[in-house]
Amino acid sequence: MEMQDLTSPHSRLSGSSESPSGPKLDSSHINSTSMTPNGTEVKTEPMSSSEIASTAADGSLDSFSGSALGSSSFSPRPAHPFSPPQIYPSKSYPHILPTPSSQTMAAYGQTQFTTGMQQATAYATYPQPGQPYGISSYGALWAGIKTESGLSQSQSPGQTGFLSYGTSFGTPQPGQAPYSYQMQGSSFTTSSGLYSGNNSLTNSSGFNSSQQDYPSYPGFGQGQYAQYYNSSPYPAHYMTSSNTSPTTPSTNATYQLQEPPSGVTSQAVTDPTAEYSTIHSPSTPIKETDSERLRRGSDGKSRGRGRRNNNPSPPPDSDLERVFIWDLDETIIVFHSLLTGSYANRYGRDPPTSVSLGLRMEEMIFNLADTHLFFNDLEECDQVHIDDVSSDDNGQDLSTYNFGTDGFPAAATSANLCLATGVRGGVDWMRKLAFRYRRVKEIYNTYKNNVGGLLGPAKREAWLQLRAEIEALTDSWLTLALKALSLIHSRTNCVNILVTTTQLIPALAKVLLYGLGIVFPIENIYSATKIGKESCFERIIQRFGRKVVYVVIGDGVEEEQGAKKHAMPFWRVSSHSDLMALHHALELEYL
């Protein structure tokens, strides 16, 4: 096969095919005695004549992919009459041993090397700063190298600028493998060249800090993270004691896992392909589950939390993004329009039935407020928020406290009525007022998911029957609202806030009887009876800050004007379709 190519007519070519140095050029055109078939100076280990013969006999070596060395390597010189494509039109023979090229090639006014073999950094390494596991950047430059015969192709010392290993390797060694991917504990390496022998995954040693293309990664050994991270840029299990070559298989252990520091819960990955250990750090408070919140709240006393916060706010590291401010009547529940019959007239229902259901629910609301929530004592001392008077609470145990004999009702019904702010004066009286609001808070948190247990068996059945009749009359209005409320409540970065014109105690009774306690913690309920909704919005902004997005959902003019003043988006609810559209927008995460 070689003889067929070498005997093709070339008027300026002389020499035999058995010449180790390849075909010789006519001396009338060039003084050089020989040149390599591919026109390059490649220094390799000398081979014996028997190896040359066996290599030449291998038919699979007749082709060498042109993509092996990139698009610009071994490009023909357009002005040179002895370019390799004219000598060998279709094939090149890298297995034929070259001889040192003549130094008189410079007489033709061209450099001795082609563009791909220049010492310039035309093919510099491509740094990839986004690679976290130390994959060498020069690996991508060798991705296109491919041979069909498994022939090893070593790199010449004169080719350091082409596909170089970067600044860490000053002089590439002959016979060194072109690349080695270090990928989580295993390296796809070759023994002496590209795809020579059996290609397999070998456990080669990782690069140390002096062999990396990236000389320094930021270390996390300072400050409060010292217990989680090593002080050195590379963890100990990434480093080896010996300064080995990137492709030299290591006989000693490569994976040296360090012991985690005391007090840090860590779990090492048992997969042999993993070189790092996963440290399970505690989650942030905003991401904790409901069970974790309950467990954290149960041991609150043991952590010495004595002072009460009148206006609770989210923790500093909270990632709260959106606050949904809801109106209650005619937005979440249908109550006032039942009493007036306007809902029945609008939707074609029976007005007397509607009014009857409204009156029954109103009676149940005030009965619950008077019996269990001290509404008779607190009606004239209404508060905007449940914690507004908590600063007057001395933390006394109320398990054996008798609210009926402490003298508070007599003082409340005296001529000196409560002021507009709900504060009358007197340390003793204010403490008793704070006791009642604290007891209301305890009852709400205890029975918000079990209102039937608070009502008793007889009233529980009447309450469930009334709820079912109202839902049937209102075409499941409350169910549609609860779907949107529950979706918001399930998000860790969103919160539901209730602002109602009803007094605080009756509003709490409404929330409990309509089954809304699960989506409205008592700290998120505000009464706008005394100060108006716009002032409530200002308190909410002061509580959560101005970095979050506020969305107001209601049906009235007052909440719409308050939202407009504070540049808050307003979602009007006037029908079932508005609630369904709201839930759809929440599902698509538009809100």
Swiss-Prot record:
Reactions it catalyzes: O-phospho-L-tyrosyl-[protein] + H2O = L-tyrosyl-[protein] + phosphate; O-phospho-L-seryl-[protein] + H2O = L-seryl-[protein] + phosphate; O-phospho-L-threonyl-[protein] + H2O = L-threonyl-[protein] + phosphate
Post-translational modification: Sumoylated with SUMO1.
Record's subcellular location: Cytoplasm; Nucleus
Residues holding Mg(2+): 327, 329, 555
GO annotation, biological process: animal organ morphogenesis; aorta morphogenesis; branching involved in ureteric bud morphogenesis; cell fate commitment; cochlea morphogenesis; double-strand break repair; embryonic skeletal system morphogenesis; epithelial cell proliferation
An example Gene Ontology CC term for this record: nucleus
UniProt-annotated stretches for the region Disordered: 1-95, 150-169, 239-319
Residue ranges, compositional bias (Low complexity): 8-23, 56-75, 240-252
Effect of deleting the gene: Complete perinatal lethality in homozygotes, due to severe craniofacial and skeletal defects, combined with an absence of thymus, kidneys, parotid glands and ears. Mice present multiple skeletal defects in skull, neck, rib and pelvic girdle, but no major defects in muscle development. Otic anomalies involve the inner, middle and outer ears, with malformed auricles and eardrums, malformations of the incus, malleus, and stapes, while the tympanic cavity never formed. Likewise, mice display an absence of inner ear structures.
InterPro entries (UniProt xref): EYA, EYA_dom, EYA_dom_metazoan, EYA_dom_sf
Lineage top rank: taxon: Eukaryota
Chain intervals with Polar residues compositional bias: 28-53, 253-286
Tissue localization of expression: Extensively expressed in cranial placodes, branchial arches, CNS and developing eye and nose.
UniProt EC number: 3.1.3.16, 3.1.3.48
Necessary cofactors: Mg(2+)
Basic and acidic residues: compositionally biased ranges: 287-302
One term of GO molecular function: metal ion binding
Keywords annotated in UniProt: Activator, Chromatin regulator, Cytoplasm, Developmental protein, DNA damage, DNA repair, Hydrolase, Magnesium, Metal-binding, Nucleus, Protein phosphatase, Transcription, Transcription regulation, Ubl conjugation
Cofactor note: Binds 1 Mg(2+) ion per subunit.
Effect of residue 43 to R: Markedly reduced sumoylation
Compositional bias ranges of the Pro residues kind: 78-87
Active site: 327, 329
UniProt subunit comment: Probably interacts with SIX2, SIX4 and SIX5. Interacts with H2AX in response to DNA damage. Interacts with SIX3; promotes EYA1 translocation to the nucleus.
Family the entry assigns: Belongs to the HAD-like hydrolase superfamily. EYA family.
Disorder named in the UniProt entry: A spontaneous mutation leading to decreased Eya1 expression gives rise to the Eya1-bor phenotype. It is characterized by circling behavior and deafness, due to gross morphological abnormalities of the inner ear, and dysmorphic or missing kidneys. This autosomal recessive trait resembles human branchio-oto-renal (BOR) syndrome.
Listed name of the protein: Protein phosphatase EYA1
Annotated organism of origin: Mus musculus
